[in-house]
């Protein structure tokens, strides 16, 4: 399906571009979100008459997003989660969780603006991009910890005590050493 982009869409094009996309992408994402119009003669004429208004609105939204990005960029947010001794979370931190914390911190963000390659599954400091506008990105720091005290230590730059996972080789050496200390070996039995 051919569509006319009403705003800049990442990896697709700029406002006013006519692009060919898959039908499902257009029907489920671009058209309902107001990001595109079907590329018909009537819609092309309508877009040409409204182009100046759309560009002005886009500039206004971009300037608002830039103002928010200046305040938001570099902010740190703390998320408390349960984790094992190795530092792996019992669940994960998703874009929805981060958006809730950012909103509670006094900023406006929804889960679609938070972009994670994969959910956060370990404690520590994580850099997370927030796409406030197609052309404006702010980076925040998400501090995932087991307790508020641990979060403060992580923020101060201290290394949190995380027990390293034991490998099978380590376990075999430990068992062998314990048997040697006991005076026996596996072959003696």
UniProtKB/Swiss-Prot annotation:
What InterPro entries does the annotation carry?
Ribosomal_bL9, Ribosomal_bL9/RNase_H1_N, Ribosomal_bL9_bac/chp, Ribosomal_bL9_C, Ribosomal_bL9_C_sf, Ribosomal_bL9_N, Ribosomal_bL9_N_sf
Q: Which cysteines are joined by disulfide bonds?
A: none
Molecular-function GO terms, alphabetical: rRNA binding; structural constituent of ribosome
Task: Give an example GO biological process.
Answer: translation
Q: Which GO terms describe its cellular component?
A: ribonucleoprotein complex; ribosome
Q: What Pfam families does its record include? A: Ribosomal_L9_C, Ribosomal_L9_N
Alphabetized UniProt keyword annotations: Ribonucleoprotein, Ribosomal protein, RNA-binding, rRNA-binding
- Protein family membership: Belongs to the bacterial ribosomal protein bL9 family.
The entry's function note states: Binds to the 23S rRNA.
Name of this protein: Large ribosomal subunit protein bL9
To which species is this protein native? Answer: Methylocella silvestris (strain DSM 15510 / CIP 108128 / LMG 27833 / NCIMB 13906 / BL2)
Q: Show the taxonomic lineage.
A: Bacteria, Pseudomonadati, Pseudomonadota, Alphaproteobacteria, Hyphomicrobiales
